[in-house]
UniProtKB/Swiss-Prot annotation:
It comes from the Bacteria. Its EC number is 2.1.2.9. HAMAP family: Formyl_trans (MF_00182). GO terms for cellular component: cytosol. This is Methionyl-tRNA formyltransferase. Belongs to the Fmt family. (6S)-5,6,7,8-tetrahydrofolate binds at S110, L111, L112, P113.
Amino acid sequence: MMKIIFMGTPDFSATVLKGLLDSGQYEVLAVVTQPDRAVGRKREIRMTPVKELALEYKLPVYQPEKLAKSSDLEELMNLEADGIVTAAFGQFLPSCLLDSVDFAVNVHASLLPKYRGGAPIHYALINGDEQAGVTIMEMVKEMDAGDMIASKATPIEETDNVGTLFEKLALIGRDLLLDVLPAYRAGQIIPQPQDPSQVTFSPNISPEEERIDWSKTNRQIFNQIRGMYPWPVAHTLLQGQRFKIYEADMMAGSGQPGQILSISKKELVVAAGKGALSLKTVQPAGKPKMAIVDFLNGLGRSLSLGDTFGK
């Protein structure tokens, strides 16, 4: 049975880890994940999804803030694992650790060499791509730059958002890894280098990128909103206060960008630079997330035609 160290953090990673564990082909000697963090409005300390799963399976868990500078590093190297599997871990692996195993592979949620970095799923949606995918690649010191072992694509649907696409790609990544890892270890797959001329990056979303620019087309804003749902969430200003928009639909319409074109007890339509958007799920400052109907029958009653978002 192949002995591996698994490294990952979010739900995407947990899906891959569970696939390895349930396959019965791998002995997971240790799981490495990010430290517990404070999350949500109440800043409650929560374990990562990978840690929760590892504890369920009674696996040793390591949570170094920086693996390269951690005392855990030597202990991991002494485990004498055959290989390392990573999936959305969020840290670089030290060369000494990579050199201590026979193989190290990463499950990355993009069709490399496109979208190296930490937010490939977000950018695939924000940029309006027609497809996304997963690549299994060899680990090297440079971020997501290793030779590609296998990849698989899937269409992006109009109804997809970050959450739904994460779920789809996690399952694809799990199955693809289980399909190709034995053949790769047997030398039956020759990894292919990435084309340097086709490399693009997907760094973590910045606060500036979360803000909606109403002068953009309704398609661009629609893609931004779904490319940040359920996190980090696109936002604008309304009456000087932050106003988050979780979901919206594209509509025909014209007016000054950000201007309210139509308002009723059930619908709120806002002009974009081209076309318009009907807001569906929102969150006013200091309030919980709510359906647009609830907003319009509460705080939204003070709004009227011609009021403008973004100010």
